[in-house]
Amino acid sequence: MATGGGVTSREGLRYAEYLPPSAQRSDADIDHTAGRRLLAVGLGVAAVAFAGRYAFQIWKPLEQVITATARKISSPSFSSYYKGGFEQKMSKREASLILGVSPSAGKAKIRTAHKRIMILNHPDKGGSPYLASKINEAKDLLEASSKAN
Protein backbone atom coordinates (compact mmCIF):
# COMPACT_ATOMS: atom_id res chain seq x y z
CA MET A 1 0.00 0.00 0.00
CA ALA A 2 2.54 2.57 1.05
CA THR A 3 5.77 2.74 -0.83
CA GLY A 4 8.84 4.55 0.38
CA GLY A 5 7.18 7.01 2.75
CA GLY A 6 4.47 7.94 0.25
CA VAL A 7 0.78 7.53 0.81
CA THR A 8 -1.66 5.75 -1.50
CA SER A 9 -4.39 7.77 -3.12
CA ARG A 10 -7.11 6.23 -0.97
CA GLU A 11 -5.30 7.04 2.26
CA GLY A 12 -4.34 10.46 0.92
CA LEU A 13 -7.98 11.41 0.61
CA ARG A 14 -8.66 10.13 4.07
CA TYR A 15 -5.81 11.80 5.87
CA ALA A 16 -5.30 15.02 3.95
CA GLU A 17 -3.74 16.86 6.86
CA TYR A 18 -0.90 14.31 6.94
CA LEU A 19 0.04 14.75 3.32
CA PRO A 20 3.40 16.25 2.51
CA PRO A 21 3.20 19.93 1.49
CA SER A 22 3.80 19.09 -2.17
CA ALA A 23 0.70 16.85 -2.32
CA GLN A 24 -1.69 19.32 -0.65
CA ARG A 25 -3.86 21.73 -2.64
CA SER A 26 -2.12 24.91 -3.53
CA ASP A 27 -3.30 28.39 -2.59
CA ALA A 28 -4.00 29.07 -6.26
CA ASP A 29 -6.59 26.26 -6.33
CA ILE A 30 -8.29 27.71 -3.29
CA ASP A 31 -8.31 31.19 -4.87
CA HIS A 32 -9.93 29.81 -8.04
CA THR A 33 -12.76 28.29 -6.02
CA ALA A 34 -13.34 31.51 -4.12
CA GLY A 35 -13.17 33.46 -7.37
CA ARG A 36 -15.81 31.26 -8.97
CA ARG A 37 -18.11 31.69 -6.00
CA LEU A 38 -17.58 35.43 -6.00
CA LEU A 39 -18.30 35.59 -9.73
CA ALA A 40 -21.50 33.54 -9.30
CA VAL A 41 -22.70 35.80 -6.48
CA GLY A 42 -21.91 38.89 -8.55
CA LEU A 43 -23.83 37.56 -11.53
CA GLY A 44 -26.77 36.73 -9.27
CA VAL A 45 -26.83 40.24 -7.81
CA ALA A 46 -26.63 41.75 -11.30
CA ALA A 47 -29.52 39.56 -12.50
CA VAL A 48 -31.67 40.62 -9.53
CA ALA A 49 -30.81 44.28 -10.17
CA PHE A 50 -31.79 44.08 -13.85
CA ALA A 51 -35.03 42.26 -12.97
CA GLY A 52 -35.86 44.93 -10.38
CA ARG A 53 -35.17 47.72 -12.85
CA TYR A 54 -37.41 46.03 -15.42
CA ALA A 55 -40.18 45.59 -12.82
CA PHE A 56 -40.03 49.28 -11.89
CA GLN A 57 -40.23 50.30 -15.55
CA ILE A 58 -43.30 48.12 -16.08
CA TRP A 59 -44.95 49.24 -12.81
CA LYS A 60 -45.84 52.80 -13.96
CA PRO A 61 -48.18 51.83 -16.83
CA LEU A 62 -49.45 48.85 -14.86
CA GLU A 63 -50.32 51.10 -11.92
CA GLN A 64 -52.41 53.32 -14.21
CA VAL A 65 -54.29 50.31 -15.59
CA ILE A 66 -54.96 48.95 -12.09
CA THR A 67 -56.21 52.35 -10.89
CA ALA A 68 -58.53 52.72 -13.89
CA THR A 69 -59.91 49.21 -13.37
CA ALA A 70 -60.52 49.87 -9.67
CA ARG A 71 -62.44 53.03 -10.52
CA LYS A 72 -64.61 51.13 -13.00
CA ILE A 73 -65.36 48.39 -10.48
CA SER A 74 -66.39 50.85 -7.78
CA SER A 75 -68.82 52.62 -10.10
CA PRO A 76 -72.52 52.36 -9.18
CA SER A 77 -73.37 50.33 -12.28
CA PHE A 78 -71.60 47.30 -10.80
CA SER A 79 -73.22 47.57 -7.39
CA SER A 80 -76.67 46.19 -6.66
CA TYR A 81 -76.81 47.92 -3.28
CA TYR A 82 -77.88 51.45 -2.48
CA LYS A 83 -74.88 53.59 -1.57
CA GLY A 84 -75.55 56.62 0.54
CA GLY A 85 -77.06 57.76 3.80
CA PHE A 86 -80.67 58.07 4.78
CA GLU A 87 -82.82 61.04 3.84
CA GLN A 88 -84.29 63.26 6.56
CA LYS A 89 -87.85 62.16 5.77
CA MET A 90 -88.04 58.69 4.22
CA SER A 91 -89.48 58.61 0.73
CA LYS A 92 -91.23 55.72 -0.97
CA ARG A 93 -88.22 55.27 -3.25
CA GLU A 94 -85.81 55.06 -0.31
CA ALA A 95 -88.09 52.61 1.51
CA SER A 96 -88.22 50.35 -1.53
CA LEU A 97 -84.41 50.51 -1.84
CA ILE A 98 -83.99 49.54 1.82
CA LEU A 99 -86.29 46.53 1.54
CA GLY A 100 -85.21 45.60 -1.96
CA VAL A 101 -88.70 45.56 -3.44
CA SER A 102 -90.44 47.71 -6.03
CA PRO A 103 -92.38 50.76 -4.77
CA SER A 104 -95.61 49.18 -6.01
CA ALA A 105 -95.03 45.78 -4.34
CA GLY A 106 -97.87 44.05 -2.52
CA LYS A 107 -98.17 43.54 1.23
CA ALA A 108 -97.00 39.93 1.12
CA LYS A 109 -93.85 40.79 -0.78
CA ILE A 110 -93.12 43.70 1.57
CA ARG A 111 -93.55 41.48 4.64
CA THR A 112 -91.31 38.70 3.31
CA ALA A 113 -88.62 41.22 2.38
CA HIS A 114 -88.92 42.85 5.83
CA LYS A 115 -88.67 39.49 7.57
CA ARG A 116 -85.62 38.46 5.53
CA ILE A 117 -83.77 41.71 6.26
CA MET A 118 -84.73 41.83 9.93
CA ILE A 119 -83.41 38.30 10.47
CA LEU A 120 -80.03 39.54 9.25
CA ASN A 121 -80.09 42.90 11.08
CA HIS A 122 -82.05 42.27 14.30
CA PRO A 123 -80.58 44.10 17.33
CA ASP A 124 -80.93 40.99 19.53
CA LYS A 125 -78.66 39.12 17.10
CA GLY A 126 -75.98 41.83 17.03
CA GLY A 127 -77.53 44.12 14.44
CA SER A 128 -77.78 47.88 14.65
CA PRO A 129 -80.88 49.31 16.40
CA TYR A 130 -80.71 52.33 14.08
CA LEU A 131 -80.80 50.14 10.96
CA ALA A 132 -83.61 48.07 12.46
CA SER A 133 -85.66 51.22 13.05
CA LYS A 134 -85.05 52.35 9.45
CA ILE A 135 -86.07 48.92 8.13
CA ASN A 136 -89.26 49.03 10.22
CA GLU A 137 -89.95 52.59 9.05
CA ALA A 138 -89.52 51.49 5.43
CA LYS A 139 -91.95 48.59 5.94
CA ASP A 140 -94.53 50.85 7.59
CA LEU A 141 -94.26 53.45 4.83
CA LEU A 142 -94.63 50.90 2.01
CA GLU A 143 -97.52 49.10 3.74
CA ALA A 144 -99.31 52.41 4.30
CA SER A 145 -98.88 53.37 0.66
CA SER A 146 -100.08 49.93 -0.51
CA LYS A 147 -103.24 50.32 1.64
CA ALA A 148 -103.96 53.69 0.03
CA ASN A 149 -103.75 52.15 -3.47
From Swiss-Prot:
The keyword Protein transport applies. Its main location: mitochondrion. InterPro entries: DnaJ_domain (IPR001623), J_dom_sf (IPR036869). The keyword Membrane applies. One of its GO terms (biological process) is cellular response to starvation. It comes from the Eukaryota. Keywords: Chaperone, Membrane, Mitochondrion, Mitochondrion inner membrane, Phosphoprotein, Protein transport, Translocation, Transmembrane, Transmembrane helix, Transport. The chain crosses the membrane at residues 38-54. Residues 94-149 form the J domain. One of its GO terms (cellular component) is mitochondrion. Acts as an import component of the TIM23 translocase complex. Stimulates the ATPase activity of HSPA9. Negative regulator of the mitochondrial respiratory chain. Prevents mitochondrial hyperpolarization state and restricts mitochondrial generation of ATP. This is DnaJ homolog subfamily C member 15.
